[in-house]
Structures are given as structure tokens and as C-alpha cells.
């Protein structure tokens, strides 16, 4: 048994003898000692002094006596907690001795069992002795996270998924305690997770740094429990001090248990909890699980960030000797900055060091670069800070300043406080005109580098497109002159050209919430201007300026009224300006005294510019503008309140109903972005005007046609036989009807990744899988043994189709198991069979093996010495479809072979071979010669790799996008490394030969 000395604490009791423990077990009411009550109050702690601090004018002895005589409530609470912890700690040792006594009472026949129990108790004892409080370094930071929720909330599955990466359906009634290492901003932290089995108590509320409230989206009771638990926690601790996260779990949602808590109610609860984020998670396939805990850790660290000291007005005080001083310290409570007074006995040296520390922190925080919106250094502020801290300093702060005649050293790097406060000469003050010109220039920190400067750029908030967690995130948005709108997470990502996304502007329009489309806004015009317009059509056309569809009405060459039009209104403006107004489908009442009417093709379009007759000057334009705004906002909400409610948002809508929501800082910035985007949309439409009449013969349309017609079985739904399916499952490689696609979505994306043939994007890897498998091949695997069950038809009910689909893909009832061979000739392992199928490019065998085996089979090695995996072999032969299938089924893209080469290195080698082959074929075609056909395969019938430039290039891009590392560098070893030829190195033979 290990040496066990936990009772070195002054409150500790002596160790009881085993016989005493045995006697206590027999007579539990004897020899029971009361809890220790001895407490030394002669030197109160800082925390205790803070709670009951006397005034600064009181003497030190009087203050100490007051604290001892009447301990405040925080001191009582801390004392009680300390005594309870001591009792808990001391109760372990007698219990362990009691277990040893009971083990000794076991008969000799059970000696082996007794020894096994003794060994386990020793392990428990060692773990207790070496617990975190005695062993871990003080420099290791910890994060305390609490998880609360009802028994059927799904919190245990959420924690289990985060810790293990797997799904556990059973709920743990007693909760649990867990530890995990997390990395945040490159720093390692010890995360302590406390899964509370019941309602939060006082101890739990005082322990946590953050709380996650969990409820199930299909259980009303778990949702109401969150309210009760939050109310109970509020009795023990201020909710404003604790970061909170609300999580709704989707694990129990099914056809029988539909969702009952909609998104609106959940977000209402999150807003009621204050400072609370809301997520919807699914522990079954890991949706948002990592994100929830990462956000909780970030919130804890944000709560702990020290706030810079706030400068207070100088209050002169008389320094005293060794007394109970008042040291200002930061109290980051409720997100507000403020100073509190901490009673603390200070010596003169400590007071002087403390004063210097606060002065340096204030100076460093006030000299940050102005681009970070921190004010310049103010010497008066520093003096006031010194005055505020002078109540604990024993020397005049002027004694710390250098002599007046001594010149300060000139720094060579960033300007310091002293350098900024030095007097400058008036000889080289820049002129005001140059300074104004310099201010007009854009700051270099606000512009991207490395590329041409876009038309418009800046930070906007973008709403997440995920339906489960629609939140606003700050993005760096750029509007390019080639008809693209790009956005990146930050300016640095834009400068590095990483993590960016783009929106092509050829087939989109821009809208502002709460406003009608810009082409449908109208200002009703005087009908008398119609004849003038037709007579002066050319002159009216000349007034179109300033961007897309901007209409300018010049009055006395000074007053102008501009109305921006949408793209749909541009065509009608041109028609109207040509001299003939377009007829409206709806009648409009005109007042007969107004200026211009602008609308789209559904109403009259009149344009009144600088009309030739100057006598027709109109004075009543402004009232119509107000009328137009009243029509635009027909509700009782004021026009100036509409912008506030909309939040200065605008959104871009594409032809396939995709939307990108953005939000600007104010209405002016939003209007600038909308106008700039409209201008680029107009330019993009003009640039493709000549190509509109051409036939649509793009690669995507050809690929879609090939998927429908060339792949066997794709003319009908894979599960019910409905004709002309329009939906697909990517990882299964099949087409299905819209009703079966809904069933596939309910299975989860880990079983079936559903996409639309006509609405979604189809990158090359997805197309290659669809072209390689198809409905006929997939059904030959997934329906190879239907056990005489009748397949539903297209007229069958949805319930019948769902039962068939779940039995087919989820339960895998119709699969034929892999053959084991005979005892004399056993079949290879599934991993070796998969390697064999990859080398032969046998798609059917690959689909069958992946369907029958767990994901670990995708990382099998060729042999003990040849550690190549199926993914490495697929990349070596440049097979894009097989590589994508393996990646979807859990293949490790970071695995390296025995020489440190990754799958990306193999893919690049295949790309080089494909490029060389293509160049050779092009040269032969230009020379008029023919390339001899390759010799038939001689190595067991293995087909020669057919390297294709498009497929290998797409494979390289796929691996790069997934973050696959480059080839690992060679490490020093005791033997010479093998030659690093790309594919010419003689590898060990696999089951079927050598690649």
C-alpha cells in the first residue's frame, strides 16, 4: 500500500488504528468526534477583510478586532465550506482502512478474490492521494463547466459525444464528473465538466464558471425544467456573472416523437436567460457538439479577461505608516469597469511596488495604436491615477520622475509614453492642407494587399445560412469589378486569400427588408409632362446617370431628386424614355400637379428630365416623396423607426432561391453597398448579354444528363421505382424521387447525404461518385437478399416506403455478408479485400465492403511493413470516385506511408503522370503519329491506371480543401533512406500485385 499522509493540515485528526475502525463499525455511535472548530482569526485573509472592511480612518487594531468579533456572511460561508471539505477529505481514510479490515475477514478460499479487491483499493487510494489539488501545477489553468437539464433532456449523450466521439442513448441519472484537455488560442486548459444529476444546488452554483442548460426539442417537460433550474440558480448566484448557453437536442426526434419546441420558443427562452447563446445539437452525428463546448470555453475566458484600471480624479490623502491600507483592484462584475477597495495590510515596499505596477499598466493601456480606437496618452490622466493610488504609497510620486534637465533616451521602436509627451519643434509642423489630404487617403490597415483594390470593401455582419443556428458573424466583404462579391472571416484571411467564399452577381438581385423592390416605388407625375417627355425623349434619356437606373430630375440646374431603380425597372425606363409610355395593368389616381413616375413594367413609366420648356417648373415634389414613403410603410410604424427595426440589413437573392443576409453599421453604409452591388449586377448583365442567345452546353448540364441517361437504373427511383428522379444521395451514389428523399433526410447525413440535381452545386468529386455507382449497381448490393419482402412501388404509402428504406440502409437487412471462405482456404480480412478492390477499381466490391464493415476498414494497411492504406492506393492510381467514397467513410487523410508520403503526395504524382500523358498525346496528334495501345495487364488481370488530368486535378483540390498535409519531411535514422522515386519504387506485393 502506498504511503498515505493526507492529514498534515492543522485541523487534521490522528490516523485511527484498523482495530479502532473495526470497533467503530460495530459501535457507530461511539467515539464520534465533532467537526473541528478551531480557526485562527488573528490574521484575517484578504477575502475575509474585503467583506467587512472598516473605514480608512479607523486604526489597524480596531479593524482587526471588529473583523474577529463579528465575521460577515461571506466569511461564515467560506468557513462552512472549508470545514465541510475537511470532513469529506478525512472521511476517505477511515473508509479505506475499513475496507482493508473487511478484506482480511474473507475466508482463505477467497484469497485470490481478496487480493484482487485489495489491488483495486490500492489503485483508488493512489488516485485519491494524487488528485488534482495535490499534484497539478498552479500554472495550469482550469475551466469549470456545469451541465444541467432534466433526465430526458439528452445532456448525458451530449457530454458523451463530446468526450468520446460516439453516441450513447442511455441517460445517466446520477450525472458525472469529467476532465478533458482543450486548446484555445494555442493555450492548453484543463476543462472540468460537471454533469449535474438533479437541480443545481448552492455548491454547484458557486463552483461553475459557465453553465449549459440542455433540453430536448421533443419534450415539453425538459423545456420547462430549464426555467425552473435557472430560477433556482438565481437564488444562489447572480446570473449576470455566469456565461450561459442554451442547447436543444434533436436526438429523440422521430416520426413517433415529433418536434414540439419550435425555434421561436427556444430563442425566446435564450433571450429570457440573458447573455445566453442558443444551439441545436444532435449527438447522433455530432451536429454543433464541439461548437457548444468551444463557445462555452471562450465565454469563460472572456469573462476572466482583466479590465484596464479606470482613472479616477485625484484625491489627496495623507500617507501613514504600516496600517490597514486600501489597495484599488479590478472587479470585473457584470461587464463594467470599476474599482473596489480591498483592505489589506501593506508594508511600504509593497505599497510602492503596487503603485508602480498600476502606473505601468495604465501607461501601457493608454499608448495603444490609434487604429484600435484607444485615445492618445494623456499626462493628466496618469497624474490622476497616481493621485488615486497615493493613499498606499509612502513616497512622493515626483521623486520617481527623472531630473528636469536630463534628456530621455530616444527609442528605436514603437513610440512610448515618454516619447509621445516630449515637446516637438514647430519648424516641421505639416501644413493643414497636407494633413487634410492625408486624412482623405484610406488607411492601409483597412485595405487588402496582394491584389488589385476592389470597388468597395469593408466589414459587414453576415447571417449564418445554417437553419439550426442562424447567428450574425462579422465578415470582411469585398465587391470586385469582375462581378463577384466575396467575404472572408477577417481581413487577414482576405489578405492571405484563404477561407473565402464568393457570390457571382450575374443571376442575383439585392433587396432591403421592409421596402418594396426599388423598381416598384413610384412618384405619381403630372400627366401634362407626358407630351413633353415624348417630344424630348432624347433629352430625357440623357438625364439617366449615377449608377444603375438612377433617375435625375434637374430643377433650375440646382435642385435634383434621384431615385434608384432596380434591374427590372431599367428596361421599362428605356422603353418609356424612347417616347412611348408603357400601359399599366392597374389604374392609378394622379393628382395632376406632380413631377415623375417610375416603376417596373406593371405600371406607367414617365421620365421628366430637364424639359425644354423652362416655364414648366414644378414646386410640389417633396409632398409626393412623403406620400410615397407612407405607401411604402402602410403600418403604424414610423418611417425613421423602420430602419432601426430592420437593423440596416440587405440581402442578396439568387435565381435558385439562395439568400445571403448582410447588415451594415448604419443606413448610409447600407445604401452605399446596395447601390454598388446593383451597379455591378447591371454590369454583369451587360457583359453576358451577348451570350444569352447561345445554347446552354456547360459541363454541369452535360454531367447531369450523363447521370440521368448513361448510368444504368438512374431513370427510376432507387427505392420505389418512380420515374424521372430529381434527388440524389451522394455517398450512396443513387437517384430517388422527392418523397423518398425526405425519408433519406430523416436517416441523417451519416447514412445518406441528400442533394438536388437541379438546385445544388455539383463539384467534380460528387459527380464522379454518381457516375461510378448508379441505381442498378447500388441495388445489387443493398438489395442482394431481400428475404422475400416486397419492394414498395411509387403508389405505396409513405409509411411503407420509410419502413423499406430504414430496413435497407439503416438496419442493413438486405445485405449479403462477406464470404469467410473455407477452413482450408480462409478468405482475406475485410481490409485486405478492400485493398484488393481498390487496386482493381472494383466499385461494386468496394460498395459491398464499406456497407458491411465499420469505418476502421478504410484505414487498413497493406501489410505490417507496407503501411499504405486504401486511400493512398486510390490516390496513387488517380481514382477520384474511390478516393471520395473512402473519405466519406472515415479514411484518414493525414496517414503517411513508410517514407512519410501522404495521399496528397500520391495525388500530385498521379496528376503529373496524367499531365505528361496528355502532353504526349497532344504532341503525337500534332505530329500525325499514333500512340501504340498499352499492353494488356499481365499481373493477375489488374487494369493499368487510366490517369486523367481533370480527375487528378480535382483529387488534388479535394485533398487540399480538406487540409491534407504535404509529404512529411524525412527524419534522421540509423540506416540510409530508400529512394524517393514517385511511383517507381518497388513496394511490397499486396494481395493482387504491385501498383
Swiss-Prot record:
Annotated stretches, region: Small GTPase-like: 137-340
InterPro entries for the chain: Ankyrin_rpt, Ankyrin_rpt-contain_sf, Arf-GAP_GTPase_ANK_PH, ARFGAP/RecO, ArfGAP_dom, ArfGAP_dom_sf, P-loop_NTPase, PH-like_dom_sf
GO CC list: membrane
Location of the PH domain: 453-682
Signal peptide interval: none
Binding site for GTP: 149-156, 193-197, 249-252
Basic residues composition-biased segments: 1-14
Annotated GLD domain residues: 138-322
Disordered, as annotated region: 1-56, 308-340, 394-451, 576-599, 617-640, 970-995
Compositional bias of kind Basic and acidic residues: 434-444
Transmembrane stretches, start-end: none
Biased composition (Low complexity): 15-32, 42-56, 409-418
Pfam families per record: ArfGap (PF01412), Ras (PF00071)
Keywords (A to Z) from UniProt: ANK repeat, GTP-binding, GTPase activation, Metal-binding, Nucleotide-binding, Zinc, Zinc-finger
ANK repeat placement: 866-898
Role of this protein: GTPase-activating protein for the ADP ribosylation factor family.
Protein name as catalogued: Centaurin-gamma-1A
Organism name: Drosophila melanogaster (Fruit fly)
Phylogenetic placement of the source organism: Eukaryota, Metazoa, Ecdysozoa, Arthropoda, Hexapoda
Amino acid at each position: 500500500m502506498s504511503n498515505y499522509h493526507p492529514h498534515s493540515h492543522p485541523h487534521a485528526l490522528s490516523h485511527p488504528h484498523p482495530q479502532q475502525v473495526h470497533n467503530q463499525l460495530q459501535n457507530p455511535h461511539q467515539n464520534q468526534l465533532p467537526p473541528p472548530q478551531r480557526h485562527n482569526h488573528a490574521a484575517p485573509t484578504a477575502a475575509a477583510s474585503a467583506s467587512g472592511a472598516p473605514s480608512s480612518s479607523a486604526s489597524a487594531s480596531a479593524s482587526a478586532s471588529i473583523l474577529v468579533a463579528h465575521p460577515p456572511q461571506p466569511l461564515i460561508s467560506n468557513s462552512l465550506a472549508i470545514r465541510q471539505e475537511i470532513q469529506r477529505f478525512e472521511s476517505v481514510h477511515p473508509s479505506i482502512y475499513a475496507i482493508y479490515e473487511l478484506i482480511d475477514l474473507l475466508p482463505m478460499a477467497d484469497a485470490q478474490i481478496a487480493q484482487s479487491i485489495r489491488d483495486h483499493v490500492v489503485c483508488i487510494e493512489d488516485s485519491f492521494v494524487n488528485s488534482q489539488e495535490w499534484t497539478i501545477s498552479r500554472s495550469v489553468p482550469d475551466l469549470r463547466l456545469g451541465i444541467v437539464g432534466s433526465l430526458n433532456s439528452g445532456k448525458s449523450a451530449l457530454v458523451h459525444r463530446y468526450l468520446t466521439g460516439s453516441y450513447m442513448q442511455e441517460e445517466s441519472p446520477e450525472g458525472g464528473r469529467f476532465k478533458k484537455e482543450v486548446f484555445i488560442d494555442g493555450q492548453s486548459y484543463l476543462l472540468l465538466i460537471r454533469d449535474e444529476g438533479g437541480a443545481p444546488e448552492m455548491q454547484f452554483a458557486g463552483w461553475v464558471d459557465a453553465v449549459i442548460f440542455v433540453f430536448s426539442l421533443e419534450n415539453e417537460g425538459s423545456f420547462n425544467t430549464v426555467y425552473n433550474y435557472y430560477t433556482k440558480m438565481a437564488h444562489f448566484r447572480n446570473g449576470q456573472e455566469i456565461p450561459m448557453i442554451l442547447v436543444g437536442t434533436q436526438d429523440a426526434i422521430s416520426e413517433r416523437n415529433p418536434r414540439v419546441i419550435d425555434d421561436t420558443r427556444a430563442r425566446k427562452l435564450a433571450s429570457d436567460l440573458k447573455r445566453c447563446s442558443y444551439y441545436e445539437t444532435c449527438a447522433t452525428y455530432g451536429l454543433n457538439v464541439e461548437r457548444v463546448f468551444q463557445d462555452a470555453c471562450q465565454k469563460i475566458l472572456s469573462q476572466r479577461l482583466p479590465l484596464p484600471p479606470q482613472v479616477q480624479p485625484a484625491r489627496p490623502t495623507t500617507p501613514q505608516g504600516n496600517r490597514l491600507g486600501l489597495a484599488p483592484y479590478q472587479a470585473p462584475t457584470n461587464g463594467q469597469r470599476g474599482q473596489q477597495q480591498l483592505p489589506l495590510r501593506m508594508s511600504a515596499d509593497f505599497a510602492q511596488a503596487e503603485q508602480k505596477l498600476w502606473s505601468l499598466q495604465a501607461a501601457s493601456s493608454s499608448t495603444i495604436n490609434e487604429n484600435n480606437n484607444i485615445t492618445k496618452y494623456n499626462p493628466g490622466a496618469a497624474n490622476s491615477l497616481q493621485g488615486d493610488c497615493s493613499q498606499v504609497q509612502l513616497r512622493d510620486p515626483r521623486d520617481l520622475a527623472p531630473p528636469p534637465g536630463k534628456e530621455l533616451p530616444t527609442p528605436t521602436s514603437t513610440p512610448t509614453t515618454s516619447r509621445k509627451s516630449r515637446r516637438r519643434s514647430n519648424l516641421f509642423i505639416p501644413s493643414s492642407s497636407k494633413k487634410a489630404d492625408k486624412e482623405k487617403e484610406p488607411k492601409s490597415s483597412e485595405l487588402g494587399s496582394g491584389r488589385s483594390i476592389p470597388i468597395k470593401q469593408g466589414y459587414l455582419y453576415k447571417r449564418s445560412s445554417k437553419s439550426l443556428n442562424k447567428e450574425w458573424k462579422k465578415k470582411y466583404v469585398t465587391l470586385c469589378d469582375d462581378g463577384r462579391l466575396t467575404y472572408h472571416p477577417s481581413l487577414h484571411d482576405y489578405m492571405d486569400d484563404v477561407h473565402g467564399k464568393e457570390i457571382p452577381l450575374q443571376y442575383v438581385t439585392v433587396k432591403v427588408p421592409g421596402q418594396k423592390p426599388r423598381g416598384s416605388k413610384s412618384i405619381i407625375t403630372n400627366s401634362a409632362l407626358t407630351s413633353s417627355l415624348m417630344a424630348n425623349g432624347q433629352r430625357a434619356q440623357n438625364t439617366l446617370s449615377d449608377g444603375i437606373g438612377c433617375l435625375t430630375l434637374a430643377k433650375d440646374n440646382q435642385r435634383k431628386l434621384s431615385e434608384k431603380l432596380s434591374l427590372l425597372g431599367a428596361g421599362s425606363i428605356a422603353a418609356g424614355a424612347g417616347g412611348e409610355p408603357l400601359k399599366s395593368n392597374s389604374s392609378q389616381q394622379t393628382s395632376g400637379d406632380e413631377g415623375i413616375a417610375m416603376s417596373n413594367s406593371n405600371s406607367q413609366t414617365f421620365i421628366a428630365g430637364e424639359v425644354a420648356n423652362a416655364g414648366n417648373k414644378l414646386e410640389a415634389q417633396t409632398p409626393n416623396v412623403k406620400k410615397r414613403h407612407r405607401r411604402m410603410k402602410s403600418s403604424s410604424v414610423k418611417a425613421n423607426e423602420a430602419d432601426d427595426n430592420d437593423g440596416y440589413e440587405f440581402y442578396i437573392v439568387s435565381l435558385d432561391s439562395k439568400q445571403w443576409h448582410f447588415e451594415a453599421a448604419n443606413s448610409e453604409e447600407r445604401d452605399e453597398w446596395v447601390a454598388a452591388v446593383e451597379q455591378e449586377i447591371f454590369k454583369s448583365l451587360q457583359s453576358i448579354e451577348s451570350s444569352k442567345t447561345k445554347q446552354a452546353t456547360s459541363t454541369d448540364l452535360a454531367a447531369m444528363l450523363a447521370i440521368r441517361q448513361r448510368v444504368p437504373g438512374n431513370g427510376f427511383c432507387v427505392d420505389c421505382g418512380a420515374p424521372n428522379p430529381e434527388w440524389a444521395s451522394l455517398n450512396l451514389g443513387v437517384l430517388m424521387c422527392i418523397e423518398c428523399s425526405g425519408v433519406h433526410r430523416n436517416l441523417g447525413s451519416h447514412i445518406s447525404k441528400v442533394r438536388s440535381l437541379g438546385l445544388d452545386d455539383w463539384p467534380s468529386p460528387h459527380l464522379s461518385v454518381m457516375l461510378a455507382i448508379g441505381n442498378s449497381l447500388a441495388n445489387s448490393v443493398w438489395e442482394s437478399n431481400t428475404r422475400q419482402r416486397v419492394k414498395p412501388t411509387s403508389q405505396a404509402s409513405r409509411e411503407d416506403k420509410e419502413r423499406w428504406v430504414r430496413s435497407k440502409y439503416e438496419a442493413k437487412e438486405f445485405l449479403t455478408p462477406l464470404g469467410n471462405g473455407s477452413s482450408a482456404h480462409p478468405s482475406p480480412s475485410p481490409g485486405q479485400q478492400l485493398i484488393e478492390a481498390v487496386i482493381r477499381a472494383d466499385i461494386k466490391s468496394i460498395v459491398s465492403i464499406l456497407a458491411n464493415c465499420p469505418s476502421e476498414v478504410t484505414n487498413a494497411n497493406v501489410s505490417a511493413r507496407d503501411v499504405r492504406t486504401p486511400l493512398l492506393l486510390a490516390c496513387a492510381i488517380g481514382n477520384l470516385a474511390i478516393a471520395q467514397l473512402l473519405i466519406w467513410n472515415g479514411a484518414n487523410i493525414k496517414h503517411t506511408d513508410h517514407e512519410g508520403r501522404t495521399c496528397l503526395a500520391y495525388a500530385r504524382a498521379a496528376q503529373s503522370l496524367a499531365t505528361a500523358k496528355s502532353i504526349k498525346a497532344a504532341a503525337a496528334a500534332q505530329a500525325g503519329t499514333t500512340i501504340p495501345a498499352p499492353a494488356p495487364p499481365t499481373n493477375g488481370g489488374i487494369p493499368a491506371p487510366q490517369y486523367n488530368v481533370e480527375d487528378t486535378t480535382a483529387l488534388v483540390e479535394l485533398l487540399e480543401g480538406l487540409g491534407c498535409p504535404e509529404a512529411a519531411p524525412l527524419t534522421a535514422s540509423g540506416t540510409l533512406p530508400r529512394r524517393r522515386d514517385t511511383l517507381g519504387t518497388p513496394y511490397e506485393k499486396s494481395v493482387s500485385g504491385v501498383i
